[in-house]
C-alpha cells in the first residue's frame, strides 16, 4: 500500500463531500515532512484551496484538520505555519504496512500505473566509431534502470538503440580503417589529422586483410569496408554494454532508414499537413555574420508546436539535415505503434528537446508524446588526476577498463548517485572503499548485516507480533520502508531513477542507526535471549528490510549480498 496515495485519496473524498467540485483540485502535496517532529505526513491542500475559495489558508486548514482527524488512519492533526496540515498516523497503520511488506516480499512496491501500455525508451545510441567509452556509461545505466522502473510500474517496455551510421563521421571512420587495412598488408601509412588513430581499429584492418587480401585495394567501392567496420564496432559497443549489464531489444540504423525512403515519406506527411514550406530563417545568434548567409530553405513549421524557430530540412548542398533523419526515425517509432516515447540524451543535446516534441506532435496529430531526459557529464579521476577521453586521439577509458577495475555493480550504482542532469564525479579510490563514503557498500552492508542477524537468531521463535515494535528507531525504520511504493511511483513518473539510490541509502542509514543503538543499550539489540517475543518482532522487521533492499537493488540488476566477500 502506498500510504501517501491512500491519505491523498481520503482527502479528495472528504473534499468532494464538503464542497461539490473541489475534488477536481489535484495539484496538492501529500508527503512526509522534512522534520520528523512535524508528523508522518503533511499536506498543503489548504493553501491550494485558498486560491479557489478566496479565504486565508489557515481558516481552511482549521476546517479540514477537524475532518482529517476523523480518518481511521489518523492519530492526531496539527496546523503549522501559514496553513500546512501535519498528520500523525496511528501506530497500527505502520505495523499493518510491515505485515504487508513481508506478505508481498520483493513485490512490495510493484504497481500497475502503466496498465501494460507500450513505451519506447531509447538510450546510449553512441556513435559507432569506437568501443563504448566510460562517458557513455551514465546514459546507459540511466536508461537501463529507468526501463526496469517502468516495468515495475506496469509498462510494456521496448529498449532501443539508434545507430548513427550515416554522415561524415562514418566516412571518416571508413577512411581510418582503410589505412589500417593497408598497414596490415605491409604498407607504410600516415594518419592525417581528423582521422581516428585509435588502436582499436588495427584488428579490424587485420581481419579485412586476412579475409580479402589485397582485393579491396583495387576497388573504388568501400561498401565492404564500411559494412565490416560498422558491424565490428557495433559488436564492440554491445560487448561494452554487456559488461555493464545493459541490453537493448531493438537496434535501428539511420542508414537503413534513409535507404528505405522513410525521410521522404515522413516529410511528405508533414507537407500534406501544410507544415513544410520554402522560406528564410533569421541569422542564428550563435554564429558570426561572415559565416552565415540568408538563403531560401525547406523548413518545418516547428514554431506552431512550441519550438523557438522553424527548422531546416535540407542542407545547402541539397542533402537532408540531421533533423530530417530524426523526423524519419520518430515517424518510424510511431508507425511501430509507440505513442509513448522516452529518449535519454547527453546534456549537450538540450537544444533538441523542443524540436523533437514539436515533430512528434506534428506527426501524430498530438496523439503521441515524448519525454527527453538529459544526462550530464561524468568526471573521472585516476590517482587524483582527471582522465580525459577522446576517440580521435585514441586515448580513452572504456567501459571494460572501469568494470574490470571496480566491478559492474559499483559502476552501475555510482552512476545514479546524482540526479541525471547534474555533473557526477567518479572517484576510483572511494568507490572501492569499505566505508560509509562508498554508497553501494553502505547499502550492501545493511543487507549483509540483516542476513547475519537472521542466521544468528534462534531457529524456533514465536509468531511475530509487530505491535511490540514501539521505539522511535524501530518506527522510523518501518516508516522509511513504507515509503518504497511512493518512491517507485515518483521515480518512474518523473523518469528519475536516482531516487532509488537516494532511498536505498536512506533505508540503510535508518537500519545502521537502529543496529548501533544495541551497542550502548543491550535492550535495543535485535536478538534478546530472554525475550523471544520481541526478538521475533524485530526479526520480522529485519525480514522486511531485506525484501525492500532486494527490491531496490533489483532495479539496478544488482544481486544483494548475504556475506561480504
From Swiss-Prot:
SUPFAM superfamilies: Anticodon-binding domain of a subclass of class I aminoacyl-tRNA synthetases (SSF47323), Arginyl-tRNA synthetase (ArgRS), N-terminal 'additional' domain (SSF55190), Nucleotidylyl transferase (SSF52374). It catalyses: tRNA(Arg) + L-arginine + ATP = L-arginyl-tRNA(Arg) + AMP + diphosphate. It comes from the Bacteria. Keywords: Aminoacyl-tRNA synthetase, ATP-binding, Cytoplasm, Ligase, Nucleotide-binding, Protein biosynthesis. GO terms for cellular component: cytoplasm. GO terms for biological process: arginyl-tRNA aminoacylation. GO terms for molecular function: arginine-tRNA ligase activity; ATP binding. NCBIfam families: argS. Belongs to the class-I aminoacyl-tRNA synthetase family. PANTHER family: ARGININE--TRNA LIGASE, CYTOPLASMIC (PTHR11956:SF5), ARGINYL-TRNA SYNTHETASE (PTHR11956). Monomer. This is Arginine--tRNA ligase. The gene is argS.
Amino acid at each position: 500500500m502506498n500510504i501517501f496515495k491512500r491519505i491523498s485519496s481520503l482527502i479528495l473524498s472528504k473534499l468532494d463531500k464538503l464542497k461539490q467540485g473541489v475534488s477536481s483540485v489535484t495539484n496538492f502535496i501529500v508527503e512526509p515532512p522534512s522534520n520528523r517532529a512535524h508528523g508522518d505526513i503533511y499536506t498543503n491542500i489548504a493553501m491550494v484551496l485558498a486560491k479557489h475559495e478566496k479565504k486565508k489558508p489557515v481558516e481552511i486548514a482549521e476546517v479540514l484538520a477537524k475532518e482529517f482527524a476523523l480518518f481511521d488512519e489518523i492519530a492526531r492533526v496539527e496546523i503549522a505555519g501559514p496553513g500546512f496540515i501535519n498528520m500523525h498516523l496511528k501506530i497500527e497503520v505502520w505495523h499493518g504496512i510491515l505485515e504487508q511488506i513481508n506478505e508481498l516480499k520483493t513485490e512490495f512496491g510493484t504497481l500497475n500505473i502503466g496498465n501494460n501500455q507500450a513505451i519506447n525508451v531509447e538510450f546510449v545510441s553512441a556513435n559507432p566509431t569506437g568501443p563504448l567509452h566510460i562517458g557513455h556509461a551514465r546514459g546507459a545505466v540511466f536508461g537501463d534502470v529507468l526501463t526496469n522502473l517502468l516495468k515495475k510500474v506496469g509498462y510494456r517496455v521496448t529498449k532501443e538503440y539508434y545507430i548513427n551510421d550515416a554522415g561524415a563521421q562514418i566516412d571518416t571512420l571508413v577512411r581510418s580503417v582503410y589505412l589500417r587495412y593497408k598497414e596490415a598488408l605491409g604498407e607504410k601509412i600516415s594518419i592525417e589529422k581528423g582521422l581516428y588513430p585509435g588502436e582499436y581499429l588495427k584488428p579490424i584492418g587485420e581481419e579485412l586483410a586476412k579475409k580479402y587480401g589485397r582485393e579491396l585495394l583495387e576497388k573504388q567501392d568501400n561498401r565492404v569496408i564500411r559494412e565490416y567496420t560498422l558491424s565490428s564496432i557495433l559488436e564492440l559497443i554491445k560487448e561494452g554494454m554487456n559488461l555493464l549489464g545493459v541490453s537493448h531489444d531493438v537496434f535501428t540504423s539511420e542508414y537503413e532508414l534513409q535507404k528505405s525512403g522513410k525521410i521522404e515519406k515522413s516529410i511528405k506527411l508533414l507537407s500534406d499537413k501544410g507544415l513544410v514550406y520554402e522560406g528564410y530563417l533569421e541569422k542564428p545568434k550563435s554564429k558570426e555574420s561572415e559565416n552565415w548567409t540568408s538563403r531560401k530553405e525547406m523548413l518545418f513549421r516547428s514554431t506552431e508546436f512550441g519550438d523557438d524557430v522553424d527548422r531546416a530540412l535540407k542542407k545547402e548542398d541539397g542533402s537532408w539535415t540531421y533533423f530530417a533523419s530524426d523526423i524519419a526515425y520518430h515517424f518510424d517509432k510511431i508507425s511501430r505503434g509507440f505513442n509513448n516515447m522516452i529518449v535519454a540524451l547527453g546534456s549537450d543535446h538540450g537544444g533538441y528537446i523542443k524540436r523533437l516534441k514539436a515533430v512528434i506532435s506534428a506527426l501524430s496529430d498530438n496523439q503521441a508524446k515524448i519525454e527527453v531526459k538529459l544526462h550530464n557529464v561524468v568526471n573521472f579521476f585516476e590517482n587524483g588526476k582527471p582522465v580525459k577521453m577522446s576517440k580521435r586521439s585514441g586515448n580513452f577509458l572504456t567501459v571494460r577498463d572501469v568494470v574490470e577495475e571496480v566491478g559492474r555493480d559499483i559502476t552501475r550504482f555510482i552512476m545514479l548517485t546524482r540526479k541525471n542532469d547534474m555533473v557526477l564525479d567518479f572517484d576510483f579510490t572511494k568507490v572501492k572503499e569499505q566505508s560509509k563514503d562508498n554508497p553501494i557498500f553502505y547499502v550492501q552492508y545493511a543487507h549483509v548485516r540483516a542476513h547475519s542477524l537472521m542466521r544468528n537468531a534462534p531457529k524456533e521463535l514465536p509468531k511475530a507480533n509487530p505491535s511490540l515494535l514501539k521505539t522511535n528507531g524501530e518506527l522510523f525504520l518501518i516508516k522509511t520502508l513504507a515509503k518504497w511504493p511512493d518512491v517507485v511511483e515518483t521515480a518512474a513518473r518523473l523518469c528519475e531513477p536516482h531516487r532509488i539510490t537516494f532511498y536505498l541509502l536512506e533505508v540503510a542509514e535508518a537500519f545502521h542507526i537502529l543496529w548501533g543503538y544495541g551497542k550502548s543499550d543491550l535492550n535495543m539489540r535485535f536478538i534478546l535471549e530472554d525475550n523471544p517475543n520481541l526478538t521475533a518482532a524485530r526479526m520480522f522487521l529485519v525480514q522486511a528490510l531485506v525484501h525492500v533492499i532486494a527490491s531496490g537493488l533489483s532495479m539496478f540488476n544488482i544481486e544483494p549480498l548475504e556475506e561480504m566477500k
